[in-house]
Structures are given as C-alpha cells and as structure tokens.
Amino acid sequence: MPPSLRKAVAAAIGGGAIAIASVLITGPSGNDGLEGVSYIPYKDIVGVWTVCHGHTGKDIMLGKTYTKAECKALLNKDLATVARQINPYIKVDIPETTRGPLYSFVYNVGAGNFRTSTLLRKINQGDIKGACDQLRRWTYAGGKQWKGLMTRREIEREVCLWGQQ
C-alpha cells in the first residue's frame, strides 16, 4: 500500500468504518484510491454504467458532468447503503479496521455476493484472518483476472488485518 494511503487510512480510523472505506476508495487526494474517479459516466469493464468513485445505478445521468461534491455525496450514500445491507449478516464483533475494508469490498462486488461468501462465513466463525485472506480470491471481473483488482484486494486485506496484529 502506498505510504500516503496508509497514512490517510490511519487518520480515518477515528471516523469509523465508513470513513475508512471512503478513504480506501477515494485515496488521500480524492482521486488516487482504489476506485479512481470519473466525473463523466462511462461503462466499466463488465459494461455497467458507472460514475464518480464507482457509483452505479439507474440514477446516473448520461451526458452529465458530475461535481466533486456530487461524487462525495453519492459515495457517502452508497457506503451507508452498504453498511445497512451487510451489518445484519455480521454476527460477531469486528474492529472498524476490518469492517471498513469489508465495506470497500462490498461496494465493489455487491452485497449479494458478500452474503453468500466464504468470507462472511469465516467472519461469523471468528476466523478474521481467514476472512481477510479470502479477499484475495475476488480478483476476477467478466471471467478475467485483473491486476487492478489484485492490487485492490491486497490493500483491503492489509487494512482488514490491522486489528489482528
């Protein structure tokens, strides 16, 4: 993980899991995190319309140029939704430094994939290290392994394990 991102994530810990996930996704400068940023809608590698820091959905307005503030608002809304979607399925106490990377992960792969994952089963069995290690398995999109997803999962895994050290 780049030192600047490590420092920014460490600074976000006091803000909780959503703050940690937000910094992971946006990076220290707002456009150098795990998602990058595009203010103009585009189709991602699997053909899904996407804007800002990876926001998807029917509310994307094609042809619109989004502002930095609009992108931040979309990310905050999306991460709050992720938290509501997955928190009920996590049955054990986990540190915010584990929960934050899980929010980032679910923001990327979707709550449905998380709910049926070995990763969640390991969390609920108390095997946090095993759960964090499972992140390494989620590096494919459209049937192809992507270096960017490999890098993302390594960073999410590293932060996920912070509470275990």
Curated annotation (Swiss-Prot):
CDD domains listed in its UniProt record: endolysin_R21-like
Record-listed E.C. numbers: 3.2.1.17
SUPFAM superfamilies the UniProt entry points to: Lysozyme-like
Top-rank lineage group of the source organism: Viruses
Keywords carried by this UniProt record: Antimicrobial, Bacteriolytic enzyme, Cytolysis, Glycosidase, Host cell inner membrane, Host cell lysis by virus, Host cell membrane, Host membrane, Hydrolase, Membrane, Signal-anchor, Transmembrane, Transmembrane helix, Viral release from host cell
The UniProt record lists the keyword Transmembrane: yes
Transmembrane segments annotated in the record for this chain: 8-28
Catalysed reaction equations from the record: Hydrolysis of (1->4)-beta-linkages between N-acetylmuramic acid and N-acetyl-D-glucosamine residues in a peptidoglycan and between N-acetyl-D-glucosamine residues in chitodextrins
Active-site residues, record numbering mapped to chain: 35, 44
Class in the EC hierarchy, top level: hydrolase
Membrane recorded as keyword: yes
Subcellular location, record wording: Host cell inner membrane
GO molecular function, one term: lysozyme activity
Membrane protein topology class: Single-pass type II membrane protein
Disulfide bonds: none
GO terms (BP aspect): cell wall macromolecule catabolic process; defense response to bacterium; killing of cells of another organism; peptidoglycan catabolic process
Any one of the GO CC terms: membrane
Annotated Pfam families: Phage_lysozyme
Function: Signal-arrest-release (SAR) endolysin with lysozyme activity that degrades host peptidoglycans and participates with the pinholin and spanin proteins in the sequential events which lead to programmed host cell lysis releasing the mature viral particles. Once the pinholin has permeabilized the host cell membrane, the SAR-endolysin is released into the periplasm where it breaks down the peptidoglycan layer.
Family membership: Belongs to the glycosyl hydrolase 24 family.
The record's note on its domains: The signal-anchor, which may also be an uncleaved signal sequence tethers the SAR-endolysin to the membrane until the latter is depolarized by the holin, resulting in the escape of SAR-endolysin from the membrane.
Name assigned to this protein: SAR-endolysin
Organism for this UniProt entry: Enterobacteria phage PA-2
Gene: 15
